[in-house]
Amino acid sequence: MSDKPNAVSSHTTPDVPEVAATPELSTGICAGDYRAALRRHPAGVTVVTLDSGTGPVGFTATSFSSVSLEPPLVSFNIAETSSSINALKAAESLVIHLLGEHQQRLAQRFAGSADQRFADESLWAVLDTGEPVLHGTPSWMRVKVDQLIPVGDHTLVIGLVTRVHAEEDDESAAAPLLYHEGKYYRPTPLGQ
């Protein structure tokens, strides 16, 4: 037990670090335990970009997933508190960039301050359809926003893929960038 006032002890298991107690969620589970469990799940890193009508908007997302092959649908979600949420809700289309291991700084840039995301104009260009596209990304997809579904404190975005681009040069063909336990990683194959 801690000597600090209002401290609450949490349970631990031998292989899991102790998580600071936090308020319970509506289901009765501890928010800190829930976050700790999700941190154990690695995710691919994407950057979503779009044209807001008044300039480019973008953000890092690790919730990207394929939904359907026919029609080609993908999804990701965004917090209702995101600085990009209003522009996203107004957008008809966007670009989802699947980042490579060489793009950790780009992932960090788009997870940081909104006013710095597009500050370096050498990192991006504009497609003929108006969306910003990032240079050197292993692959990206132009997506027409199909559905915006409010889910809890997030919005689930379902998009119809209208264009796919894959880079062929050696650097862009690198392994994907992963996010796990608050850090960036590259995948390595397991022994066969």
From Swiss-Prot:
> A GO BP term, please?
pyrimidine nucleobase catabolic process
Pfam families, per the entry: Flavin_Reduct (PF01613)
Q: How is it used?
A: Can be used to remove sulfur from polycyclic aromatic sulfur compounds found in gasoline and diesel (biodesulfurization), which are a considerable source of pollution. As the substrates are not very soluble in conventional media, biphasic systems may help improve catalysis. Expression of dszD-dszA-dszB-dszC (cloned in this order) in organic-solvent-tolerant P.putida strain Idaho allows P.putida to grow on 10% p-xylene with DBT as the sole sulfur source.
Reactions catalysed, semicolon-separated, are: FMNH2 + NAD(+) = FMN + NADH + 2 H(+)
Give one GO term, molecular function aspect: riboflavin reductase (NADPH) activity
SMART domains listed in its UniProt record: Flavin_Reduct
Question: Which of UniProt's keywords are assigned here?
Answer: Cytoplasm, Flavoprotein, FMN, Nucleotide-binding, Oxidoreductase
Q: Provide the residue positions that the database annotates as binding FMN.
A: T60, A61, T62, S63, N77, I78, A79, E80, T81, S82, S83, S84, A111, R117
Listed GO CC annotations? cytoplasm
Q: What does this protein do?
A: An NADH:FMN oxidoreductase which supplies reduced FMN for the '4S' desulfurization pathway that removes covalently bound sulfur from dibenzothiophene (DBT) without breaking carbon-carbon bonds. Provides DszA and DszC (DBTO2-monooxygenase and DBT-monooxygenase respectively) with reduced flavin (FMN).
Q: How is this protein named in the record? A: NADH:FMN oxidoreductase
